[in-house]
Amino acid sequence: MSVLLIEAFYGGSHKQLMDLINQEIEGCVLYTLPAKKWHWRARTAALYFMQAILPDDKYRVLFTSSVLNLAELAVLRPDLGKLKKILYFHENQLIYPVQKTQERDFQYGYNQILSCLVADIVVFNSAFNMESFLTSIKTFLKKIPDHRPKNLEEIIRPKCCVLYFPMTFPDISQFLPEHKRVSHTLADNMSSMDISHCPKTSLQAENMSVEFSHDQIQSSIGESSAEQERATISEKNICASGDPVILNASNTLAGDIRQKKPLHIVWPHRWEHDKDPETFFKVLLKLKEKELTFHVSVLGETFTDVPDIFSEARITLGSSVLHWGYLASKDDYLQALCMADVVVSTAKHEFFGVAMLEAVHCGCYPLCPKSLVYPEIFPAVYLYSSPEQLYRKLENFCKRPDVVRRHRFQGDTARFSWAALRGEFRSLLAAEPREDL
């Protein structure tokens, strides 16, 4: 028992990561708070954990997400402050798109900066997350009226590294409709290839490249598979933007079968304003006004304040809705993703995108903003630059759903798997004990 895991917001991807580490890494002890009232967790969790965590001289490493004010806990519990402290950023508050700025909102980003200063290693789930945080520190601190601290980026940056969120891709074969099975088998074969060619995440910040081009991501597929693909596919340009949609001609299901069912769009995100549901529903309502046929599943968790647009859109979309609301059963959730054709993100605040990668694993065609973390994760063909371009892509897919159903994902999800990242997490959490313990 040497690794102390602390999660102040034990839900969603935060829960997934802690559960995975707790299951896969020996000697872990996990302390959590439920994923409710995020703002209160960020303000007060340190005081709770000060009392809840039992003293134990076997602890050598403390691993926590950035929801916790690590600086407070380190002072309140000097025994924990002496541990090797690792801070993991799922998201950062320095660029959070608040609807109405209030002075108290400053505290959340400020807490994260303080936590970085006391941490020994600061880990981000993407290069975008790391760079957006570090380069925003100076601007963020300008909100302080006077006597501002200096050079904090230079102090924090040497501690920083990128270690992607480790995905566990479950067996979904039982949920796949017939037209997805061939493509998914091919994708599985590609995922099982040697992953030594994948972009290397590094625990040394100075070795971390933060530029991920479309060509770099595409190159991970390999030349031999690309040659085979060129021999077995045809391309049809049905996107108004000019982006090619690649068809898998080896799949022999009849085109008229693919064309029968309306396009099924899924939106599997938190029901909160930072995921920009307004843009998503405006695009869908425009499709409906044009009398285009489609089905939609709106999944994802809900919290205390649900934007009004959800209740309004539910009424307006009417019979187009197949699923509406959070699916607590993981199997039900995966089945809903497997039945969908296209997964859409309209997020204004995203640093990795677990839900999008889960949907891609289930055979969905991803459509993401050409911003935030998405260019780091997805090839350019899956990115859109504006709501109008998103509308045009969905309009064309509504007219030709068979094109989407023939498509095979052109990226590489294997580099985000636990199998690819296990070694780096083990190295991170197997740090040598400090001499002063």
From Swiss-Prot:
The cellular location(s) given in this protein's UniProt record come to: Cytoplasm; Nucleus
Task: List the GO molecular function terms.
Answer: tRNA-queuosine(34) beta-mannosyltransferase activity
For the protein in the UniProt heading, the enzyme class is: transferase
- Which key words are in the record? Cytoplasm, Glycosyltransferase, Nucleus, Transferase
EC assignment: the record states 2.4.1.110
Q: Which domain of life is it from?
A: Eukaryota
The keyword Glycosyltransferase belongs to this UniProt entry's keyword annotation:
yes
Indicate where this protein is primarily found: cytoplasm
The record's InterPro entries line, in alphabetical order, gives:
Glyco_trans_1, GT-like_domain_containing_1, QTMAN_N
Which reactions are catalysed by this chain? queuosine(34) in tRNA(Asp) + GDP-alpha-D-mannose = O-4''-alpha-D-mannosylqueuosine(34) in tRNA(Asp) + GDP + H(+)
Q: Does the keyword Cytoplasm apply?
A: yes
Some GO term, biological process aspect, for this entry: which one? Answer: central nervous system development
Matching entries from Gene3D superfamilies are given as:
Glycogen Phosphorylase B
Q: Which GO terms describe its cellular component?
A: cytoplasm; nucleus
The coiled-coil segments of this chain are: none
SUPFAM superfamilies xrefs: UDP-Glycosyltransferase/glycogen phosphorylase
Q: Which PANTHER family does this chain map to?
A: GLYCOSYLTRANSFERASE-LIKE 1 (PTHR13615), GLYCOSYLTRANSFERASE-LIKE DOMAIN-CONTAINING PROTEIN 1 (PTHR13615:SF3)
Task: Say which family it is in.
Answer: Belongs to the glycosyltransferase group 1 family. Glycosyltransferase 4 subfamily.
Function per UniProt = Glycosyltransferase that specifically catalyzes mannosylation of cytoplasmic tRNA(Asp) modified with queuosine at position 34 (queuosine(34)). Mannosylates the cyclopentene moiety of queuosine(34) in tRNA(Asp) to form mannosyl-queuosine(34). Mannosylation of queuosine(34) in tRNA(Asp) is required to slow-down elongation at cognate codons, GAC and GAU, thereby regulating protein translation.
Protein name, per record: tRNA-queuosine alpha-mannosyltransferase
Q: Which gene encodes it?
A: gtdc1
